[in-house]
Amino acid sequence: AFYGVSLFEIINYIEHYGLLRQKDVNGKYERVLPEHSWNNNNIVTNLFLYQLQRHSDHHAFPTRPFQALRHFDEAPELPNGYASMLLPALIPAWWSKIMDQRVFDHYKGDLSKANIHPKKRKKIFEKFGLAFNRD
């Protein structure tokens, strides 16, 4: 059970790292869209994992059967499949080296839209040469 829960949580971390649904003027989160989770369109891996790496389609359309999950160009793309991302996800410096630039690129440099741990926010803004605002 420990192994299963741990694997589930690591994959969940990989699928959503740095991504954040924005709030509207009423404080409600925007509808879940394909750009709110990371995908990987590797055909072989998707066959073995029942299209799990087309995670964005699953979130945007939760009732769609796994066989029909689609690729979305607007969904952010992981550099490798889940199996290749497991070990880096457990080593923060390695993971940061792989993923932080991708989060930055996904939000077109506007890290105020990214999901960043409050204690690491200033460091990440400085890493990309951005002015840090505590607001």
Positions of predicted regions on the chain:
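Cytosolic/stromal cytosol-facing helical appendages immediately following the last transmembrane segment
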Residues: 3-135
